[in-house]
Amino acid sequence: MAKQAFSLLTLLLFSHLAAGQNISGSELGQLRDTQRASVEALTIFGADFGLSGGEFHTSGERLPGTAFSADMSVNKFGGGGDVGAPQSLGTLPIGWQPVIQGSMGWLDSTNHLETGPLKGDASKYSVYAIQFGGGIRFWLNEALSVAPTVMGMYGRTSNTYDANSLYGRENVSGFMQRGIVDWEVDTWTVRPALDLQYLLTLHRTIVTLSSDAVFFDTESFSSSNKSMSVVGTSGSWDNKLDVDVPLGVLVLGHELRTGGYLSRTELYGGLRNGLDVKYINEVHARLVLDFLSQRWRPQWIGIGGSYLWGTSITGWTVGVDVMFRF
């Protein structure tokens, strides 16, 4: 659901090539800072269960005469859920239950330069990341709850540069020596979050209003090039309206349900800068079989699909829609 990082290297180089200039030390430092933000953003986007995966495309002209397009594929497996039924919190009129969360993801990003001396070159990013954690959901009444959680995430990001242009082939070794391309970096991320939910029941239809604020603190601990180190903070704020509608039709002994959600996620810090995306909207629809009465099994299984859009980015995803009850 987010836009992939475009080739910052080619954008900066092309603006200097047109004037016959070299990259200064300060500009090289600025380029590396932007690359670090891209690593931070792609790692989070590649695995965080709060951000949707899918197929994404973006294009534009970041600098005059520097047209580019970018394609990104994000595959994720994971999610989160509440464990058991709410228990009383001492003598207080508050219920509580554990929350578990986890996700793993893979991201592949290809950035194509479409104009100038570097036309035909491509900068590619690959990300593998995994996260796990949990917290406690506190029920203030039967409808309103709040869940503080903490997760940890490990990620590995690698970059390769396909020098197809004459200029690229002649200079790619210099790019590599400067640590601009062809590197690997390992990162860890701490992810505290606060989720607020309100449930509405209309006959048998369930409406869930939620607001999820997340903070990310990311640092690298290993890199193939000493010039590539990552330290950054990011944030996201997701607001969602989810509707679950029972259809009263049995299939294989289970009731058929439909529904979906509409959400808007604001991005902040390195996540916004690295993806060059301010927000992402998502509309999702699903058709599932209900397993609601069976604990420690899927709550529902079916199919679902989403369309996502935001600043200069579009995306889509279709797949198996599963929710578990523990």
Label the model's feature ranges:
Residues 14-17:
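N-terminal signal peptide c-region/cleavage motif recognized by signal peptidases
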Residues 25-33, 89-236, 242, 262, ...:
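Outer-membrane pore/translocation modules
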Residues 221, 226-326:
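Outer membrane beta-barrel transmembrane domains
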Residues 1, 205-209, 322-326:
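Charged interaction patches that mediate protein-protein contacts
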Residues 40-43, 204-208, 246-251:
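Short N-terminal helix-initiation segments at or just after the protein's N-terminus
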Residues 20-118, 326:
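Short glycine/proline- and aromatic-enriched beta-strand/turn motifs that initiate or cap beta-hairpins
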Residues 2-11:
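Sec-dependent signal peptide recognition
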Residues 81-89, 134-138, 194-202, 245-249, ...:
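Residue-level signature of outer-membrane beta-barrel architecture
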